[in-house]
A protein has these predicted regions:
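Asp-box/WD-like beta-propeller blade repeats and closely related beta-sheet repeat scaffolds
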Residues: 79-146
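Beta-rich catalytic cores
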Residues: 15, 41-44, 91, 139, ...
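A short beta-strand motif characteristic of beta-propeller blades
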Residues: 32-38, 80-86, 128-134, 176-183
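Loop-centered beta-sheet repeat module
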Residues: 151-205
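Short glycine/acidic-enriched loop and turn motifs that connect beta-strands
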Residues: 12-15, 59-63, 110-113, 159-160
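Short loop/turn segments immediately following beta-strands, especially the blade-tip
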Residues: 22-29, 71-77, 117-125, 166-173
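Residue-level detector of Asp-centered blade-edge/turn motifs that repeat once per structural unit
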Residues: 1-2, 48-51, 97-101, 147-148, ...
Length: 205
């Protein structure tokens, strides 16, 4: 019998209560034991590193605060909240972990911003470090580390633009306008992946 555990992020504007866990029976193709493991508002994007789960979101029934949270994945696959950083405004839409720099980076579609957060020695979310925001039609949709581990590459859906940020020694970000560039007008870039050799970037529009 082959079974795998999976976690599902959701919108909580309706009946959903947060992050769900399920068991997938890969022999039978069945989903079993669906249950709520973390009650948190709108955890719409999740990422996992080792025994940690990170999510975007906001407190339930309070969407005037938004941010990121970290959880321990326990031995029974339940989740235990270990850290959070919430700011005034809408929640981010995407979250990414950069383990080598003990850093979390989030992209905020509604607030037009890229935010960084520090991780403590246990890789739990500690404090907010920096925020970069535009004042134009920007809609920040995704951000990730470049293959050389020196820059943050962000996808600006609202401006059809790929933007580069330098990671400073204190893990704050500096915008590098001369390395940023526009995609085809109206293409709507949403995500970027790099080839294994680091020579190519693939943009999903």
């Amino acid at each position: 019998m082959n079974k795998s555990i999976a976690y599902i992020g959701t919108y909580t504007n309706g009946a959903s209560e947060g992050i769900y866990r399920l068991c997938l029976d890969t022999d039978k193709g069945n989903i079993e034991d669906l249950s709520v493991v973390a009650r948190f508002g709108n955890p719409t994007y999740l990422c996992i590193h080792n025994n940690k789960l990170y999510t975007v979101g906001n407190p339930l029934s309070l969407d005037t605060l938004g941010g990121v949270a970290s959880y321990n994945i326990e031995e029974d696959y339940s989740l235990k909240l270990t850290g959070a950083s919430l700011l005034q405004g809408k929640k981010p839409c995407h979250i990414n972990i950069i383990p080598d720099k003990s850093l979390i980076v989030s992209s905020n579609f509604h607030e037009k911003s890229i935010n960084t957060y520090s991780l403590n020695e246990n890789f739990d979310i500690d404090t907010s470090l920096s925020a970069f925001s535009h004042k134009d039609d920007s809609k920040m949709h995704f951000a990730s580390i470049t293959p050389d581990n020196k820059f943050i590459c962000a996808v600006n859906l609202g401006m059809d633009r790929i933007e580069l940020f330098k990671i400073n020694s204190n893990n704050t970000l500096s915008y590098i306008e001369n390395l940023s560039f526009y995609c085809t007008k109206g293409c709507g870039p949403r995500h970027i992946e790099f080839s294994k050799n680091g020579k190519f970037a693939y943009v999903i529009c």
